[in-house]
């Protein structure tokens, strides 16, 4: 387990989304296999007392029937997962998730500074914030971008991180490696990894 004192960031699990296996593509044969593996990897990385910021697209539908005819609800997925989960609204999340609150966006204080968190990259970001975490992995874009205003965008989607949650410490290392590698290649557009 990694050091998770600053919380974990994760998105786009899309539990119950059969077609996401093909769209991304994900390395699973069935949606049941995907759901089970995502839960297993989450619980391997996240402790019972950890905080997880899930930046949208938690599940595809509020109800999912698996191959064993078990009906999974939004709450059923949450009950299988370690940690306290703060859910952000994504474009695939059902509008009413059994009264569970969904955040639109937030600025959180972390050991690497203030970070803007949202499902959608770069929308409504306060100008003084330089680090942005988003969970929109189905943009099929890079994991890290730095724009011409020197804002750092990090996609925390599971598809980019071997289907595990990613910690603040791991994100910090990624950003440092990215900046060091691309320091000489910088132009006024966007850097990508």
Regions found by a protein language model. Give the residues of each.
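Generic serine detector
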Residues: 6, 62, 67-70, 118, ...
